[in-house]
């Protein structure tokens, strides 16, 4: 089936199923283009709650579909590629987290949304890269166990007076962006501003002109007087940047900054998920209710 036919069929089935398509900025360009809403993790969570559709097709990795299912238990959430998992989410386990909580009984667990529903259920509050600092600063506790990303934990620690106890996880895609990569690109494009995602290594963030979530990076590039930008995150964001400010130039900091899991979802899989209503995301009730409390606490935090 040609791409134009795929798109038309997807549109027909969206109407038939009363479905909405949500996609992360790291998705394939053609998937972003057929989505009703494209955003970062915080924006996608907020949009899922706002939706009145019966079916949510979530073009992303498994934890994203789980979050939508937790927040919208009355909706059918479909994940076009059920094997699209997040390596970082798999770096934290329940038993290990429980041991850490026992070691630090006065600490509050802040869970980055890039984690499983079970880990969210073991946490007090969730956060995204867009609101992590505000979430941590909203807490009364002075100690925070931050899971699973040590790089985001380090970024938050540099912007709070709280004691951060980091979990030893990381995003492989962001972690392999090196300081040397940035310096080479800066030498090649001396007029370009370097904007970076807080999942990057601390030594990479030290070189950044601006640090933000994916949506924050788009807004910065759009509103900045600069005309060129080196992008320190997954390469899929370039599509959103070009759409937001097509007159500007963008350079991916590394050719290796590509998440294989996020690229697993394609138009064919979106179509099949709508045709067969397959890969429905389910979360056990006892996990869902506790995880929802952590997500709801996050959504209640006001950000700048």
Swiss-Prot record:
The gene is nadA. This is Quinolinate synthase. Keywords: 4Fe-4S, Cytoplasm, Iron, Iron-sulfur, Metal-binding, Pyridine nucleotide biosynthesis, Transferase. GO terms for molecular function: 4 iron, 4 sulfur cluster binding; metal ion binding; quinolinate synthetase A activity. Binds 1 [4Fe-4S] cluster per subunit. Gene3D superfamilies: NadA-like (3.40.50.10800). It catalyses: iminosuccinate + dihydroxyacetone phosphate = quinolinate + phosphate + 2 H2O + H(+). InterPro entries: NadA, NadA_sf, Quinolinate_synth_type2. GO terms for cellular component: cytoplasm. The keyword Membrane does not apply. It comes from Methanosarcina barkeri (strain Fusaro / DSM 804). It is an enzyme of class 2 (transferase). Its main location: cytoplasm. The keyword Transmembrane does not apply. Its cofactor is [4Fe-4S] cluster. Catalyzes the condensation of iminoaspartate with dihydroxyacetone phosphate to form quinolinate. Belongs to the quinolinate synthase family. Type 2 subfamily. PANTHER family: QUINOLINATE SYNTHASE, CHLOROPLASTIC, QUINOLINATE SYNTHETASE A.
């Amino acid at each position: 089936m040609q791409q134009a036919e795929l798109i038309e069929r997807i549109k027909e089935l969206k109407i038939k199923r009363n479905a909405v398509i949500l996609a992360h900025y790291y998705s394939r360009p053609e998937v972003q283009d057929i989505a009703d809403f494209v955003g970062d993790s915080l924006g996608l969570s907020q949009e899922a709650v706002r939706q009145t559709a019966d079916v949510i097709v979530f073009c992303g990795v498994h934890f994203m579909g789980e979050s939508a299912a937790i927040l919208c238990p009355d909706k059918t959430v479909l994940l076009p590629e059920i094997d699209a998992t997040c390596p970082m989410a798999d770096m934290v386990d329940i038993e290990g987290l429980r041991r850490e909580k026992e070691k630090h009984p006065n600490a509050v667990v802040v869970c980055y949304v890039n984690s499983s529903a079970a880990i969210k259920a073991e946490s007090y509050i969730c956060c995204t890269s867009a609101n992590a600092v505000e979430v941590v600063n909203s807490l009364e506790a002075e100690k925070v166990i931050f899971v699973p990303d040590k790089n985001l934990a380090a970024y938050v620690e540099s912007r709070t007076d709280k004691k951060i106890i980091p979990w030893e996880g990381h995003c492989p895609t962001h972690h392999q962006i090196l300081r040397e990569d940035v310096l080479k690109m800066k030498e090649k494009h001396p007029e370009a501003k370097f904007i970076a995602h807080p999942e990057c290594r601390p030594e990479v963030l030290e070189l950044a002109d601006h640090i933000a979530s994916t949506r924050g990076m788009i807004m910065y590039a759009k509103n900045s007087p600069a005309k060129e930008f080196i992008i320190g995150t997954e390469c899929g964001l370039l599509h959103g940047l070009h759409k937001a400010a097509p007159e500007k130039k963008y350079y991916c900091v590394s050719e290796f900054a590509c998440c294989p899991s996020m690229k697993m979802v394609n138009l064919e899989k979106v179509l099949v998920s709508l045709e067969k209503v397959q890969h429905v995301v389910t979360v056990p009730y006892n996990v869902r209710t506790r995880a929802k409390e952590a997500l709801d606490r996050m959504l209640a935090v006001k950000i700048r």
